[in-house]
Amino acid sequence: MRCVPVFIILLLLIPSASSVDVQPLTRDDVPLASFLDDARRTLRSPWMTRRCCPGNFACCGK
């Protein structure tokens, strides 16, 4: 009879211990870091084209 309360407490602790996301990742899931990198790259491109001088096209698009 001493084991019954311990068993009940263990059963109550098991569901609260699963803090891991149980859904598997799909191909459509994109990490936030790559999303932010894409946003920075997109914002950097117009800034770089504005810095180009009209006489020197070699600096454009870098």
From Swiss-Prot:
GO molecular function, one term: toxin activity
Keywords of the record: Cleavage on pair of basic residues, Disulfide bond, Secreted, Signal, Toxin
Residue ranges the record assigns to the propeptide: 20-50
UniProt note on tissues of expression: Expressed by the venom duct.
Subcellular localization(s) per the UniProt record: Secreted
Domain of life of the organism encoding this protein: Eukaryota
Pfam families with a match to the protein in the record: Chi-conotoxin (PF16981)
PTM remark: Contains 2 disulfide bonds that can be either 'C1-C3, C2-C4' or 'C1-C4, C2-C3', since these disulfide connectivities have been observed for conotoxins with cysteine framework V (for examples, see AC P0DQQ7 and AC P81755).
Protein's name in the database: Conotoxin Mi5.2
Source organism: Conus miles
